[in-house]
Regions:
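Hydrophobic alpha-helical transmembrane segments
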Residues: 1-181, 186, 194-255
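RNA/tRNA-interacting regions in translation and RNA-turnover enzymes
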Residues: 191
Length: 255
């Protein structure tokens, strides 16, 4: 009985993520099929257009975006649970679906490819490097030096390693496939409405704070992994000290 439970746990819990990591390392972001993040973005954008106006914007943003987070967690869990109860065919569909969804939520290879392209281009020509890094950063790159282009690319790699790899895998470890989907919904909300400007300050307040919360551990684990990879654990006090100085409670640690 115990052996059967272990096999079942491996097959329907661990195997989808292992396969997803393998697929991501070989293929990167899939481009043939529609991406779930695009669907998330449409839902978030629909609500923003309708509710980010007039009075009570913070309340409306909290209710709508909180509802999206809750529905993502519940519906993904419910769908997989129902499939698992349909016998061997349903279980196979659940396994494939969980694998594909986890694969879609990872962006390790794509991130590495983008940063590698920046280094190749800046080594070839500074202006080409500026154009390439502009694809992955939100700042003005027109006046960056070659070293600043490389630094910007590495900072983006560090921060997005948390959002695109460590955070999703940790969320999956805690709550399975529903967890990784919910994490990416929160992350997508923050990237769309979690800003401090006049338009989003009130409406995106909940999304920004929730994203800060769910990334507290991933950001610090990412920093630890980077220090381990570089063999520089002696820099831990520096990272802990300087990370606190960033405007974001999380971004400063991996950067």
């Amino acid at each position: 009985m115990l052996e059967a439970l272990i096999l079942l746990s491996f097959t329907f819990y661990f195997l989808p993520m292992l396969l997803a990591i393998l697929l991501d390392s070989k293929l990167g972001d899939p481009t043939i099929l529609g991406h779930p993040i695009i669907f998330f973005g449409r839902l978030i954008g629909w609500g923003e257009k309708r509710f980010n106006r007039g009075k009570y914007r913070r309340l409306k943003g909290t209710l709508y975006n909180g509802l999206l987070v809750g529905l993502t967690l519940f519906l993904s869990w419910y769908l997989l649970e129902q499939l698992l109860n349909l016998g061997s065919i349903g279980q196979m569909v659940a396994l494939i679906l969980a694998t594909v969804l986890c694969f879609y939520m990872l962006s390790g290879k794509t991130l590495i490819d983008e940063v590698s392209a920046v280094f190749r281009e800046v080594d070839r020509e500074l202006e080409a490097g500026r154009r390439q890094v502009a694809r992955i950063v939100g700042r003005d790159t027109a006046q960056l030096s070659a070293q600043e282009v490389r630094t910007a690319a590495l900072e983006t790699l560090a921060e997005n390693l948390s959002d695109g790899v460590v955070g999703p895998i940790l969320s999956w470890a805690l709550l399975g496939t529903p967890g990784i989907l919910t994490y990416k919904m929160i992350n997508t909300q923050d990237s769309m409405v979690g800003y401090l400007n006049e338009r989003y300050r009130a409406y995106g307040f909940f999304s920004a704070k929730l994203d800060d919360l769910v990334n507290l551990l991933p950001s610090r684990l990412t920093a630890l992994f980077l220090l381990l990879g570089a063999g520089r654990l002696d820099l831990t006090p520096f990272v802990l000290r300087e990370g606190k100085k960033h405007l974001s409670p999380n971004s400063g640690y991996p950067e």
